[in-house]
């Protein structure tokens, strides 16, 4: 039990590292005051540039991927891996270094699920790519990919703990997109430009 709490706390602290904020500051920009104000890859892409956006995406994804892979490598079963992944995700969204504020969690969730359920990621990624290709809204693709992920996990042979973690992650991702949802409804959401 103590080892499990250690892993969960460590994953949370790793997830709490604000990748986008730190990369933005390297370029003299506080992304919380630019664009959407979000510290995630999409805002970095739009306000700082493509390279920094991709670096942010990679860093945020690794924050979810690495602790889960390490827990797996050290012999922890899927239920503990799921809690470790949830902790890393919560660290990103509710960062201890940002007074429990943070990003929307999409890239970190991607990393978590690449480690825990890579086949399920393919299904969610297909939904994301299709919606972004047709409507050009990153937020819509992210919201719908999050929404389908628990359904995919439900129909795959995974532990109940992973399903619970997936439902919680999906719910938080969708809730964190509340302002995007309002803009989508109003027709004022920014479209993705490659």
Swiss-Prot record:
Gene this protein is translated from: plsY
InterPro entries tied to this protein: G3P_acylTferase_PlsY
Keyword Coiled coil: no
Localization (cell): Cell inner membrane
One Pfam family named in its UniProt record: G3P_acyltransf
Name of this chain's protein: Glycerol-3-phosphate acyltransferase
Enzyme Commission identifier(s): 2.3.1.275
Bilayer topology term: Multi-pass membrane protein
């Amino acid at each position: 039990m103590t080892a499990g709490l250690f892993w969960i706390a460590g994953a949370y602290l790793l997830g709490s590292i604000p990748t986008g904020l730190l990369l933005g500051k390297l370029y003299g920009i506080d992304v919380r005051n630019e664009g959407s104000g979000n510290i995630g890859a999409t805002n970095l892409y739009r306000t700082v540039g493509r390279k920094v956006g991709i670096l942010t995406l990679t860093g945020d994804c690794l924050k979810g991927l690495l602790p889960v892979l390490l827990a797996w490598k050290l012999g922890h079963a899927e239920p503990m891996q799921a809690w470790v992944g949830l902790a890393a995700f919560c660290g990103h969204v509710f960062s201890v270094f940002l007074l429990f504020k943070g990003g929307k969690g999409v890239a970190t969730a991607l990393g978590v699920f690449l480690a825990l359920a890579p086949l399920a990621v393919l299904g969610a990624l297909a939904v994301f790519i299709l919606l972004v290709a047709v409507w050009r809204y990153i937020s819509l693709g992210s919201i719908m990919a999050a929404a389908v992920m628990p359904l995919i996990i439900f129909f795959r042979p995974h532990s109940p703990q992973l399903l619970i973690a997936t439902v919680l992650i999906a719910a938080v991702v969708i809730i964190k997109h509340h302002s995007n949802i309002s803009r989508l409804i109003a027709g004022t959401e920014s479209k993705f430009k490659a």
